[in-house]
Amino acid sequence: MALDITFPDGNVKQFPDGTTVKAITEGISNSLAKKAVAGKLDGDLIAYDEPIAHSGQLQIMTKDDAEGLTVLRQTAAFVLAAALKDLYPDIHFGQGQATEDGFYYDTDRADGQVSVDDLPTVQKKMEAIIKENAALEPVVLSRAEAFQAFKNDPFKKQLVEAAGDPIKGYKLGDFVDFEEKVLLPSLKDLKHLKLLSVAGAYWQGKSSNPMLQRIYGTAYWSEKGLEDDAKRRQEAAEHDHRVIGRDLDLFFVDPKVGAGLPYWMPNGATIRRVIERYIIDKEIADGYEHVYTPVLANLDLYKTSGHWDHYREDMFPPMDMGDGEMLELRPMNCPSHIQIYNHHIRSYRELPLRIAELGMMHRYEKSGALSGLQRVREMTLNDGHTFVALDQVQEEFKKILRLIMDVYEDFNITDYSFRLSYRDPKNTEKYFDDDEMWTRSQSMLKGAMDDLKLDYYEAEGEAAFYGPKLDIQTKTALGNDETMSTIQLDFMLPERFNLTYVGKDGEEHRPVMIHRGIVGTMERFIAYLTEIYKGAFPTWLAPTQAVLIPVNNDLHLDYVNRIKKQMLVAGLRVKVDDRNEKMGYKIREAQTKKIPYTVVVGDKELNDAAVSVRRYGDEHTEEEAGNMFIDALVAEVKNYSRDGKTKPGEATKVLGD
């Protein structure tokens, strides 16, 4: 039976049954064959030298394609397992995967785990296996054969139970692994790899399952790829908010309490408090009414909103109160804000009605997905909802967008882009059923962007079921795109909760609900800022804005304490380092803690009513009059936060008085 193969250019050719991707590639050109590593048939990766199963659309995957790198790393994970089995015959295996930047394999040993010190030995064994260049043989096992092959491995047996029949695998010498992924046709190209680290991971990501040991590595087609990867990892480590958070004592996670439940230390709590006060003041000034709503709610609320039907896997189990009442930790704040809207009869004169809250939420995140402050189980969202008439959408959208960009400016966030998401015009039946509302609202959002003369990407088919949206994507410290802010129109929740307002005509009308997040959750935003600033927070955000160091406590401490008092009165965050340590040590420690200003006071400064100031990152110090330094610092803080409450010169008295 012939195979009808359609190529990316639309050409269709027939090939005999049993033809491989390799045979087709070699028939196209030798240069392509040298780079090819796999195929993609109707969107699914297929092995390079196995018979093509059926007719379809075929793409040749090469070393230049992302899929090619995935195949390389899947092969590296397989060889890692083979090396581990050779070194530790008693080892059990979970699953191995290629990742965005490498690969891993989950393992378990009864007789002691593999440590990071063992990785050079394991890598040497991998390199020896690769050097032998033994054939990677595809194998097909019946379920019974697979059970026999993995009879001593409890985790592989679970995978076999969940798999179909027959089961695909690969054989390398005496080593056989249950492997439905595509591997390289041979090991000759697997030359540039490195094992990186060891960490714990629950089996299948469930905390109720055994903790396995995850061995991480990476692989590239060239040595340069490995070198560039090492540089990126070093840079990532220097920006990693988890490392910086530990070094600057911002937050910690206690396993006795639970993963994904961070404790905010005084330094981190100060940063968070400054941001929270800032954002609340910004929103109130922009017409929002700030509220507090319960973190618990009756489960029926989330059934009405649809969260229980569509997001149940992300919600914690309900709490049965024993009297028929079921309470739920809220996964989102919008149903609570709807209750506030619905608490009164609303008039068109009240619209737009803007409600905002720093609302605590809970998400049922698997332990394997948790990461520092970026992925947590308890979070506080800078959340807001506006209720508008349909003809107010465009102006309100612009108002929200201006607020977002104003906040970005204060935090010096300059690298961002806009993505406007519409419904799919060819598949409208999967969206909320109101063509006129969709047409008008999408036109309004586009009109608002054009009015503000902003560049944006239009993404058809990416809108939510219930309305179009705008995502604002910022660049992380490592140059990756991350959605920071969202403006989302919602036609569905007003219907579900029967929201109305009385119009000019005296009749009831349905409002449009606009969800908007300015900076997302406090946890994720502070993680982002920590990495962007590399821990060197701008003065207005820094937990300690200045440290004062007397040269001699007996002679200079009284003067230093007077300076401290004036700075505290001015609303600044300042500490005195009067420990019995060497001056150089104190200054170095202040720099290590990334405190914006280190202020030293000795005889000259005392006599001149002055201070010697060293800015973080500078090598030199400058002498300034004490009053002028404090005024300049107050002005700097005011400039970052635009709070306007203290004018330079108002906060200080003559320090020599």
Swiss-Prot record:
Major localization listed first in the record, in broad terms: cytoplasm
Domain TGS as annotated: residue spans: 1-62
Catalytic class of the enzyme: ligase
Record CDD domains: TGS_ThrRS (cd01667), ThrRS_anticodon (cd00860), ThrRS_core (cd00771)
EC number of this enzyme: 6.1.1.3
Cofactor(s) named in the record: Zn(2+)
GO cellular component: cytoplasm
Example GO biological process: threonyl-tRNA aminoacylation
Disulphide bond pairs: none
Binding residues annotated for Zn(2+), in chain numbering: C334, H385, H515
Ranges where the record places region Catalytic: 240-538
Location relative to the cell: Cytoplasm
InterPro entries registered for this protein in UniProt: aa-tRNA-synt_IIb, aa-tRNA-synth_II, aa-tRNA-synth_II/BPL/LPL, Anticodon-bd, Anticodon-bd_dom_sf, Beta-grasp_dom_sf, TGS, TGS-like
SUPFAM superfamilies: Class II aaRS ABD-related (SSF52954), Class II aaRS and biotin synthetases (SSF55681), TGS-like (SSF81271), ThrRS/AlaRS common domain (SSF55186)
Cofactor note: Binds 1 zinc ion per subunit.
Pfam families with a match to the protein in the record: HGTP_anticodon, TGS, tRNA-synt_2b
Gene Ontology molecular function terms on file: ATP binding; catalytic activity, acting on a protein; metal ion binding; threonine-tRNA ligase activity; transferase activity; tRNA binding
Keywords from the named record: Aminoacyl-tRNA synthetase, ATP-binding, Cytoplasm, Ligase, Metal-binding, Nucleotide-binding, Protein biosynthesis, RNA-binding, tRNA-binding, Zinc
Biological role stated in the UniProt entry: Catalyzes the attachment of threonine to tRNA(Thr) in a two-step reaction: L-threonine is first activated by ATP to form Thr-AMP and then transferred to the acceptor end of tRNA(Thr). Also edits incorrectly charged L-seryl-tRNA(Thr).
Family: Belongs to the class-II aminoacyl-tRNA synthetase family.
Assembly behavior: Homodimer.
Name of this protein: Threonine--tRNA ligase
Annotated source species: Lacticaseibacillus paracasei (strain ATCC 334 / BCRC 17002 / CCUG 31169 / CIP 107868 / KCTC 3260 / NRRL B-441) (Lactobacillus paracasei)
